A protein has these predicted regions:
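A metal-dependent hydrolase metal-coordination microenvironment
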Residues: 1-84, 128-142
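Short, composition-biased local secondary-structure segments
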Residues: 54-63, 109-112, 191-193
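Domain-core and long-helix interface of multi-subunit machines
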Residues: 67-167, 193, 212
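Short, functional N-terminal and low-complexity linear motifs
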Residues: 53-56, 105, 145-148, 249-253
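Short loop/turn segments at strand-loop or loop-helix junctions that form parts
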Residues: 40, 53-56, 100-101, 264-268
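C-terminal functional module detector
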Residues: 18, 22-28, 34-37, 84-92, ...
Length: 270
């Protein structure tokens, strides 16, 4: 937070840009990057939540109220459940939803079979994560009315992971309220992301040696790999467990999901 305050300034309502002293002089002002305040937090049941903030002031207030080990790493751990975190986020004008909702380690669907079991009601959005796309998620009935987001890690130490998934929103002005309104009112024009088959957690695999297994073989082995590692259910199988339909039932508001291959991946195979 101190770094954000040191290097950026609010250029419009809830939107930030670099201060002049931190700008690259070779970049045109017309191409200047803009920032919105977000964080990913881990609750007491190890479910990860994405919060999008309207202001620095809201960040400071919520930071105090969440009372967790806030400085442990880029993903604060909070001694509250999802419902409590959502109530605080909404109290201060934020929007909130589950991060990487299907991954086998720290996601809402790793811990719960229904979103309402976590929040008590539906969240503002659901982040798909790298190992799932709209076609997979729209086989789950309870997600029909929830906007999907495709985001990249902002807490990764590897710069090439920034921006590898992103969203296209229909807004009138670049302000927090317009971004919030586009998400809540389903004015997302497109999701851009990985082919989920490229995702780290797409298939059932050992968490230690990364050997992949069919779910039947994994269950017969009691989810233990011969190497001594734990076998974790893949996102594809977890969605199969949760799904009502064999094929996606896209609601009318669902935007296209456009599969992309990040530049770093293209370079690595050339």
């Amino acid at each position: 937070l101190a770094l954000v305050e040191e290097t950026t300034e609010e250029s419009s309502d809830g939107i930030f840009s670099l201060k002049d002293s931190f700008k690259d002089e070779e970049l045109s002002d017309n191409n200047e990057s803009k920032f919105i305040l977000t964080t990913e937090v881990e609750d007491m049941k190890r479910v990860h939540h994405l919060i999008i903030f309207p202001s620095i002031e809201a960040v400071k207030i919520i930071r105090t109220k969440l009372k967790g080990n806030m400085d442990a790493d880029g993903r604060p751990r909070i001694r509250m459940d999802g419902k409590e975190i959502m109530e605080i986020a909404h109290e201060y004008g934020c929007i909130i939803g589950p991060a990487h909702a299907f991954t086998p380690w720290t996601s809402i669907y790793k811990t719960y079979d229904s979103i309402k079991d976590c929040y008590g009601k539906m969240p503002d959005f659901l982040e798909l994560g790298l190992s799932a796309d709209s076609g997979m998620a729209d086989t789950i009935e309870e997600l029909q009315n929830i906007p999907f987001l495709t985001n990249s890690d902002a807490h990764s130490p590897w710069p090439h992971r920034l921006g590898r998934e992103f969203n296209e929103l229909e807004i009138n002005k670049l302000t927090f309220e317009d971004v919030k309104g586009a998400i809540l009112n389903k004015h997302i024009k497109a999701n851009y992301g990985f082919d989920p088959r490229l995702g780290k957690y797409h298939l059932t695999a050992c968490s230690k040696c990364y050997t992949q297994y069919t779910i039947d073989d994994a269950l017969n082995m009691k989810m233990k790999c011969p190497c001594g590692g734990r076998i974790k259910k893949g996102v594809d199988y977890r969605i199969y467990e949760l799904s009502k339909w064999k094929t996606p039932h896209h609601p009318i508001h669902r935007p296209p999901y456009i599969h992309i291959l990040p530049l770093a991946e293209i370079i690595s195979i050339t």
